[in-house]
């Protein structure tokens, strides 16, 4: 009888440990001399970096005793955090309610429903502020309900400090000069930055935000088309002390760079990934030759 020693008990055990890949085709196309390496978070079970956050926030709430078995989790989100939370909540037996503007796509709603989430739509004109208010109203009405608050929850950034950053350091054998990430909640860039700078304080950390809404640099909040980053406010988790540079990326350039990852690498990536790649390849950011 064959014994399978590495069979996961459930999908939560497959979160993290995502591979790194050199963007060799993209680098050749633009004559870039440095090694640009992408961390393929799409290899997570629900398809994004937010799987890490969903698991971390739920396990943290369990450990603190605020989330009881079978309880209701509420979160205002229209993005991949909702997908990650839905997957983990289903596995762990929680009821998940997601509040989001009615302007969100039918496809996104159907995906979340398929994963077991209950969708509560709010006035589209009120944006995410309306969804946040609705989440608080539901929490106050439902006994034992918990809002995980991804923009404020320290376990969000801690997940990236303990996993994402450490994985990058390990899998590059410490050959990292610059780390670039978009800012939505701020958890990825700041958490990973803390881990990397513990190993080497000279690693240069770049935060990416939409040029249309450059709030991290003190600019005015405004609509933009880079889904997944640019919350139009400075998140509580964003720690400017670990960020060396903020690069604003135009919407059209982020979209184009995302498409070029597909044509140059066969890599299907979102607009926020395109923004990060643009920040590396279309700015004055300089990296030492033959380093990541």
Question: Which role fits each region the language model picked out?
Answer:
Residues 2-285:
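PLP-dependent amino-acid enzyme catalytic core
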